[in-house]
């Protein structure tokens, strides 16, 4: 049973508004370069930024990815410096990169919880109950007796110089078959799902992008309370 942790305070170091940039479809490596550019500027006093976009189909691997979790057919994978394991990005999936200067003392787990809570809130607004699974990061649809727990949103971040990079991916109306070639997030005993698959109607990125932007900002600044549940596993580099 979850309790509610009061969070009337922002996790951000800056009180200035977050700049939200909706970029459409962007190549993964180009977006990664942009993240690093913005993060460097943020570390030097620039604004907090939330990038919202989609990627052309691509597999990316976090630092804990094992060889056997990669595509068996040798499909190329981009190795990244984020936490977590391997995942897929592609059309129909909303990717968010919050590049945020965290308040001291840094609480990276709390940051991840706030991202999770923002996406849990969006799913609830759409009529889909979701939550967390103990010991696993991300947002999940609960097992229903027929199907196992299913991940609908993945989270993988890195923190450098007190600034966050990478972020979350919410499956809206994407091709779930793309996850079949890998062990998504290194988890073998659970499934992957999307808003469209769960709700029985098409739920595209365009329908949720504004909701996600608002919820992420509300969660980061403490206007959405975070339920107290087991901590997400994250990695930080200073």
Swiss-Prot record:
Localization, UniProt: Cytoplasm
UniProt-listed GO biological process terms: protein modification process
Site (Lowers pKa of active site Cys): 151
Cellular component aspect of the GO annotation: cytoplasm
BPL/LPL catalytic domain ranges (all copies): 44-224
One Pfam family here: LplA-B_cat
EC code(s) of this entry: 2.3.1.181
Reported function: Catalyzes the transfer of endogenously produced octanoic acid from octanoyl-acyl-carrier-protein onto the lipoyl domains of lipoate-dependent enzymes. Lipoyl-ACP can also act as a substrate although octanoyl-ACP is likely to be the physiological substrate.
Note: In the reaction, the free carboxyl group of octanoic acid is attached via an amide linkage to the epsilon-amino group of a specific lysine residue of lipoyl domains of lipoate-dependent enzymes.
Name of this chain's protein: Octanoyltransferase
Gene name of this polypeptide: lipB
């Amino acid at each position: 049973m979850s309790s509610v942790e009061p969070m009337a305070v922002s996790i951000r170091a800056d009180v200035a508004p977050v700049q939200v940039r909706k970029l459409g479809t962007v190549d993964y490596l180009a977006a990664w370069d942009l993240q690093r550019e913005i993060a460097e500027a943020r570390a030097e006093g620039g604004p907090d930024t939330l990038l919202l976009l989609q990627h052309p189909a691509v597999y990316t691997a976090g630092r804990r990815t094992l060889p056997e979790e990669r595509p068996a057919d040798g499909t190329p994978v981009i190795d990244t410096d984020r936490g977590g394991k391997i995942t897929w990005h592609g059309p129909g999936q909303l990717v968010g990169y919050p590049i945020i200067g965290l308040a001291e003392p840094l609480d990276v787990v709390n940051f991840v919880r706030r991202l999770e809570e923002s996406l849990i809130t969006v799913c609830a607004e759409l009529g889909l109950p979701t939550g967390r699974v103990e010991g696993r990061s991300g947002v999940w649809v609960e097992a229903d007796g027929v199907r196992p727990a299913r991940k609908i949103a993945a989270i993988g971040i890195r923190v450098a110089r007190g600034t966050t990079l990478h972020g979350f991916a919410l499956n809206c109306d994407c091709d779930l078959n793309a996850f079949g070639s890998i062990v998504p997030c290194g988890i073998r005993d659970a499934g992957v799902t999307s808003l469209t698959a769960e709700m029985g109607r098409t739920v595209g990125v365009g329908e949720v992008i504004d909701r996600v932007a608002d919820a992420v900002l509300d969660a980061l600044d403490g206007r959405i309370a975070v339920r107290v549940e087991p901590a997400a596993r994250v990695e930080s580099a200073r």
